[in-house]
Structure formats: C-alpha cells, structure tokens
Amino acid sequence: MATNQEAGRHQEVGHKSLLQSDALYQYILETSVYPREPESMKELRELTAQHPWNIMTTSADEGQFLNMLLKLINAKNTMEIGVYTGYSLLATALALPDDGKILAMDINKENYELGLPVIQKAGVAHKIDFKEGPALPVLDQMIEDGKYHGSFDFIFVDADKDNYLNYHKRLIDLVKVGGIIGYDNTLWNGSVVAPPDAPLRKYVRYYRDFVLELNKALAADPRIEICMLPVGDGITLCRRLS
C-alpha cells in the first residue's frame, strides 16, 4: 500500500508530468529534484499539497528548472503573473541576488498569504512586491509610464490562459532585449494534440483553444526566439530579439 507521501507524489505525477512513464518521472524527482530541493521549497510544496486547488501549483522539477535558469541569466529584476501559494515565486526569490526584485501579481491574495510565512522564514520576502488584482491594468499603466520599457530580465506567466496573448502583447515591451518571458502550461495536459472528440475535463477543453492560439502566435512572432520544453505541464521560453 502506498504511503501518504508516495500518494501525494504520484498525484503530482498525474497532474504535472507529460512523460508516458510515471516511474520515469518519479525517478527524476527522487534522483535529482527532491534531494536538492531547498528546505523552504519543500515546506511550501507540502503545505500547498493540502490545499484544495493544489493542481494549480508549479511542479517541483519546474521549480528547480526556473531557479537554475534565473541564475544562468543573472536575473535581477523579474515579474510573475499568477502566484497561487508562491512555490515558483519562492524558487525565483531564492535565485535572485539580495537586492533582486519580483513584481508579483495575482487576483487572490489569500492564497499568497498561505505561503507567505514560508517565504518570510526563507529570508526572501523583501524581494517581493505583491499586488492583488488583475495584471492587465497594471501592465497598461507600466507601459504608459514609459520608464518600465525593457526593464525586466525575466517574466513568468502562470495565470488565466485566455489572457496569455493579451499579456504577451504588453510583456514584449517590458522585457529587455535578451530577456526571457516564460509561459507555463503551453502543452496543457497534453490536450494540444488531442482529437476534437477526446474526453477532456471541462476546464481543459475550455482553455485548450487559447493555448493553441498562443503557441501558434509565439511560433510566428519575429521579435522573439522560442523554446518549448516538456517540463511540468509544458513551458515556452521566449527570448526577446528586438
């Protein structure tokens, strides 16, 4: 019989891995992710697993990937749209220098406050500027101000899929040339290759066309170069060229 810990991990496998083999994904987690996961991220991951909406969280392997990516590009000024309890936010904050900054936006502050004590205990809360509410009005104001153009090293989007294209139209001006925008869930439970009559969950079917539209638009955007990776539920990295 599986232990509660094993059951929780396999639940993560079912929701967040696109690998055909659960055993292979479990091997990745057990071999290279969990043993190197910072204690604060482990604590927040386990706390989030008890939340009824835990399917919304970033997977542990994707958190590890984001943390390393931010270190590789020496990111200092970042943005995150869609925070939930803050697992990916914590991965980002831990990767930034002490004077690094994250503009974090989410419509639900209550979820963020669930993970905030862990973030505070990790000593990185001072890097985060959290704003509650829709992100689009904030982005529009930043663009209108003018001083934020090309100011962000990295932007991570894990929010309302039906607005991803609207985000992209604005974020391309806010990320610096050579900077990266990461869009999460771009393989959307694998539904991007599902036949029209496939039995999909209602929310998966609803957002599927928005994800497909985004993927098509990103592939055709000459202002960026892209790389779509099967990490977590799929993440597309967009490096701004001009």
UniProtKB/Swiss-Prot annotation:
Keywords: Lignin biosynthesis, Metal-binding, Methyltransferase, S-adenosyl-L-methionine, Transferase
Record note on cofactor: Binds 1 divalent metal cation per subunit.
Signal peptide coordinates: none
Binding-site residues for a divalent metal cation, renumbered to this chain: D158, D184, N185
Necessary cofactors: a divalent metal cation
Cited InterPro entries: Cation-dep_OMT, SAM-dependent_MTases_sf, SAM_O-MeTrfase
Pfam families named in the record: Methyltransf_3
Top-level EC class as recorded in UniProt: transferase
Any one GO BP annotation for this protein: methylation
Catalytic activity line of the entry: (E)-caffeoyl-CoA + S-adenosyl-L-methionine = (E)-feruloyl-CoA + S-adenosyl-L-homocysteine + H(+)
EC numbers: 2.1.1.104
Binding site for S-adenosyl-L-methionine: T58, E80, G82, V83, S88, D106, A135, D160
Residues annotated for substrate binding in this entry: K16, D158, N189
MF annotations from Gene Ontology: caffeoyl-CoA O-methyltransferase activity; metal ion binding
Pathway annotation: Aromatic compound metabolism; phenylpropanoid biosynthesis
Family: Belongs to the class I-like SAM-binding methyltransferase superfamily. Cation-dependent O-methyltransferase family. CCoAMT subfamily.
Function recorded in the entry: Methylates caffeoyl-CoA to feruloyl-CoA and 5-hydroxyferuloyl-CoA to sinapoyl-CoA. Plays a role in the synthesis of feruloylated polysaccharides. Involved in the reinforcement of the plant cell wall. Also involved in the responding to wounding or pathogen challenge by the increased formation of cell wall-bound ferulic acid polymers.
Protein name (Swiss-Prot/TrEMBL): Caffeoyl-CoA O-methyltransferase
